[in-house]
């Protein structure tokens, strides 16, 4: 910064008002002609220098105008600062830097008691401690903003798809060479089809054997292995029975999920299913409406089908007693009327339950007044 006398109260280059930019594009011109100037954190400051204030003793009104944009810590008049005739120069210090930014933007080139104000930053009045604090606050702000942007970019990255669940389970449960061969030799009569290939571990090796291998004796170990072999046979029978049953694949997946002992594997499966099951809210509502319509149409079709081929079970209820009118002509007319009433009653469609609920919950229509 160049100064005329090198003192804080002198005129610096950044105090001089910059000329209006005449090379700005037409579509970028605003209501007021402005200059192009870039401010760094070193040039910005809590101290504002107000030039062009009329010398009519309006310091109180000036401070009140600037106090609208933030708390003011101190203010004073600069008598030694060179100014035009019949004008004064004031120095105002804001508590926050953002308040000084807003006040400079709003009050620069504003009319005040017949004069045109010129507001600029005055960082030369800052102490070393104030400058250090200003730079630290700016550094913390930049760190916070960049961290938020990094988190946002990390959220936008696509989630990598899970590979085959079989590979992931093998990674979670590594093979144990010594114990596995011994257990295989102890159960030669168990058929190979009993071992389920969809499980993350062999049915012949329960987790209790792995957990208690170091604490149990050899006899206890053999007993547990034999118990595990029996449970493996039972599991093979259950699996064969399940194959012949009419359960859906989704139900089998749920039973498998309950049998998986590793919580991390369950979380991975749950996350993969949640990703595949995600749908927008509007799509869910449309799907529900479509299902309701399909169920309604299916119900009407079933009703018409059962009415056409009605199967009576149990004793037949007594019908409407026919009244003898003592006249053949009247009896024929009454029979025709009863038959017509039955046709009308049977042809009336049953309103769906959704429409009944809508009619009940909706407010009654307001009647129009007759004038």
Swiss-Prot record:
Transmembrane segments: none
Start-end of Basic and acidic residues biased regions: 158-170
Record-annotated RRM domain positions: 46-124
GO aspect biological process, one term: RNA splicing
GO molecular function: RNA binding
Keyword list, A-Z: mRNA processing, mRNA splicing, RNA-binding, Spliceosome
Coiled coil: none
Subunit and interaction comment: Component of the minor spliceosome. Within this complex, interacts with ARMC7 and PRPF8/PRP8.
Role played: As a component of the minor spliceosome, involved in the splicing of U12-type introns in pre-mRNAs.
Protein name, UniProt field: RNA-binding protein 48
Organism from which the protein derives: Mus musculus
């Amino acid at each position: 910064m160049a100064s005329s006398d090198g003192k804080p109260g002198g005129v610096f280059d950044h105090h001089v008002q910059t000329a209006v930019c005449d090379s700005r594009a037409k579509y970028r011109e605003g209501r007021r002609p402005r200059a192009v100037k870039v401010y760094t954190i070193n040039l910005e400051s809590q101290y504002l220098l107000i030039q062009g204030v009329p010398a009519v003793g309006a310091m109180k009104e000036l401070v009140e105008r600037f106090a609208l944009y933030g708390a003011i810590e101190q203010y004073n008049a600069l008598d030694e600062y060179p100014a035009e005739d019949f004008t004064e120069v004031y120095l105002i210090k804001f508590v926050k830097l953002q308040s000084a930014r807003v006040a400079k933007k709003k009050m620069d080139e504003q009319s005040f008691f017949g004069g045109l104000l010129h507001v600029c930053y005055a960082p030369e009045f800052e102490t070393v401690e104030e400058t250090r604090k200003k730079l630290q606050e700016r550094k913390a702000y930049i760190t916070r903003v960049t961290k938020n942007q990094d988190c946002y970019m990390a959220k936008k990255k696509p989630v990598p798809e899970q590979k085959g669940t079989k590979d992931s389970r093998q990674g979670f449960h590594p093979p144990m060479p010594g114990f596995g061969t011994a257990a295989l030799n102890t159960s030669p009569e168990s058929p190979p089809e009993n071992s389920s290939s969809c499980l993350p571990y062999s049915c012949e090796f329960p987790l209790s054997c792995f957990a208690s291998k170091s604490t149990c004796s050899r006899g206890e170990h053999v007993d547990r292995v034999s118990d595990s072999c029996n449970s493996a046979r039972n599991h093979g029978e259950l699996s064969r029975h399940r194959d012949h049953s009419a359960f859906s694949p989704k139900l089998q997946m749920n039973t498998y999920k309950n049998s998986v002992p590793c919580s991390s594997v369950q979380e991975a499966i749950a996350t993969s299913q949640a990703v595949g099951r995600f749908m927008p809210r509007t799509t869910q509502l449309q799907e529900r409406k479509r299902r309701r319509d399909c169920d309604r149409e299916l119900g009407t079709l079933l009703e018409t089908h059962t009415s056409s081929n009605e199967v009576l079970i149990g004793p037949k209820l007594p019908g409407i007693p026919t009244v003898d009118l003592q006249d053949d002509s009247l009896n024929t007319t009454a029979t025709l009327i009863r038959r017509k009433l039955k046709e009308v009653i049977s042809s009336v469609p049953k309103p769906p339950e959704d429409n009944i609920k809508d009619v009940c919950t909706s407010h009654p229509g307001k009647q129009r007044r007759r004038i």
